[in-house]
């Protein structure tokens, strides 16, 4: 039986691969931050309407990713649910399934620039206006 030393370890990436991933992820986060940090963002980009006016919060296909030096972590990928006005909602799930990142996305407390809510909508009803938190400056 011959032993093959040249077999790659599937859990290892080279320094060159890591640098390429980091470079690409920096480009992505810089583009998102550039859009987010614009001055005089028109209200049309973040003022919206609730799908159901009886809700105070609506998560619709929310995607929050972390762009690291070794790849992209899709912490929240396609989460959708509603929170009706006057109701208490609990989020239950296994360790590491994205419960905290989902709530941090609503509060705009995801650690930037590596963490970004890149897709979907989080509609928040203040009573006077409805904001899409994902696009709100």
Descriptions of predicted regions:
Residues 1-137:
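ABC transporter nucleotide-binding domains
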């Amino acid at each position: 039986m011959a032993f093959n030393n040249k077999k790659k370890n599937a859990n290892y990436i080279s320094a060159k691969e890591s640098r390429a991933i980091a470079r690409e992820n920096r480009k992505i986060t810089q583009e998102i931050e550039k859009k987010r940090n614009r001055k005089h963002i028109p209200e049309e980009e973040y003022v919206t309407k609730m799908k159901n006016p009886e809700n105070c919060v609506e998560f619709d296909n929310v995607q929050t990713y972390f762009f690291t030096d070794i790849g992209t972590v899709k912490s929240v990928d396609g989460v959708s649910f509603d929170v009706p006005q006057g109701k208490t909602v609990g989020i239950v799930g296994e360790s590491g399934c994205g419960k905290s990142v989902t709530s941090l996305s609503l509060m705009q407390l995801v650690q930037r620039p590596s963490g970004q809510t890149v897709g979907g909508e989080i509609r928040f009803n203040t009573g006077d206006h409805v904001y899409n938190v994902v696009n709100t400056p």
